[in-house]
Amino acid sequence: MAQQAPTMQIDNLLAQVKVLGSSLNVADRAKVQKSLLDALSHVETPYEHMLRLSGSLACIRFGADIGLFKALVESQEPLTCSYLGEKLNANANILGRILRLLASARLVKQTGLDTFTAEKITQELAAQAMESGAHLLFDIHNRTYQALPDYLCENKSKDVDNMHNGIFQKAFSTDLSCYEYLVHNPKLQGFMQDAMKLNQTEGDWLSVLPMEDEIKRWQASDPDRVLFVDIGGGMGHQCIRLRGKYSDIPGRVVLQDMPITVERIPKPMPHGIEAMPYNFEEPQPIKNAKFYYTRNVLHGLTDSASIAALKNVAAAMGTESLLVIDDLIIPDEGACTQACQLDFVMMASIAGKKRTRDQWEDKRKYNEYKCKRNSQFL
């Protein structure tokens, strides 16, 4: 029997990936994605890799601005560039070039000459959260990335740990921190808050925190007693999800965030959730709550600031209180691309970092917390 050509062998393997991929769980999908990215690095040159990534984000941002993805999603039939140009008041030739690039990245599908339709991912790109995410990546993170090489060369011996004098300040020519800058730019602030809706919902903290077991001995007979405090909780997505799953557990649920964020939250919040302006640098005003929760917040603080913030939480905790930190742990070896990219986003925009297990352990020891449970989810 003749040996198959290498390309045919690869085609057979890829066919299996396409068939089996939809049945994988979250953990297995992450492993396969990493393997596929690794395989791709063996069949393209570094320059091809750079070209593949360089233009897509700008095109996604433009497509979101003019309603391109919404138009494709809302249509039952493929649309020509001429039709899209008239509908969106855009140049048909430019649209064709943009759509070809997006199709090459599998973000839309080309069905014929200058004719395109929506892919599955196009549905996501048409959503407000993803549109805001594109703006956040392009308008803030892409700009800080451009300043990153020069900043690092100019500060070779220094760590990036000052949110008032870092890469963001060089990129935006400002003395303000990223958070302070956003306060003066409500449109960008809105993009950031909307993009938080993209947070993962499959296999998350609610699936691993034994909430019902933890509250068996906790009494909430006092109507003012607080069950759950979400510190830095944005628009309240996690509070809402908590109350949606545990609607009958007594106790108040309180969302805390910066005043400008709290002002944007529609009132009243569902399930009786309370919104409270709060800054991590201040003493924690809610005393003796059962759960103090923080999700993807400490990565935005320097080591010294995060230690100070955790001390403020510790000072408010009672004997039955628990601190729940929901954040990424960078593995010691073999970190995935997404985790490393997030680490660079934190460094470039807010002088923050995604931390390793040892770095998290140092935070715990410094604040004299006892680790009751360490749960991993994807």
From Swiss-Prot:
Biotechnology: Diterpenoid pyrones display various biological activities and FDDP E shows anti-HIV activity. FDDP D and FDDP E show also inhibitory activity of 42-mer-amyloid beta aggregation that is involved in the pathogenesis of Alzheimer's disease.
Gene3D superfamilies noted in UniProt: Vaccinia Virus protein VP39 (3.40.50.150), Winged helix-like DNA-binding domain superfamily/Winged helix DNA-binding domain (1.10.10.10)
Name of the protein in question: O-methyltransferase dpfgI
Family membership: Belongs to the class I-like SAM-binding methyltransferase superfamily. Cation-independent O-methyltransferase family.
Organism per entry: Gibberella zeae (strain ATCC MYA-4620 / CBS 123657 / FGSC 9075 / NRRL 31084 / PH-1)
Keywords, in A-Z order: Methyltransferase, S-adenosyl-L-methionine, Transferase
PANTHER family linked to this entry: O-METHYLTRANSFERASE DOMAIN-CONTAINING PROTEIN, PUTATIVE (AFU_ORTHOLOGUE AFUA_4G14580)-RELATED
Molecular-function annotations in GO: O-methyltransferase activity; protein dimerization activity
InterPro entries found in the cross-reference section: COMT-like, O_MeTrfase_dom, Plant_O-MeTrfase_dimerisation, SAM-dependent_MTases_sf, WH-like_DNA-bd_sf, WH_DNA-bd_sf
Pfam families: Dimerisation, Methyltransf_2
Top-level EC class: transferase
Pathway annotation from the record: Secondary metabolite biosynthesis; terpenoid biosynthesis
Known function: O-methyltransferase; part of the gene cluster that mediates the biosynthesis of diterpenoid pyrones. The first step of the pathway is the synthesis of the alpha-pyrone moiety by the polyketide synthase dpfgA via condensation of one acetyl-CoA starter unit with 3 malonyl-CoA units and 2 methylations. The alpha-pyrone is then combined with geranylgeranyl pyrophosphate (GGPP) formed by the GGPP synthase dpfgD through the action of the prenyltransferase dpfgC to yield a linear alpha-pyrone diterpenoid.
GO biological process, one term: secondary metabolite biosynthetic process
EC number of this enzyme: 2.1.1.-
Residues annotated as the enzyme's active site: H299 (proton acceptor)
Positions contributing to S-adenosyl-L-methionine binding: G232, G233, D257, N279, F280, R295
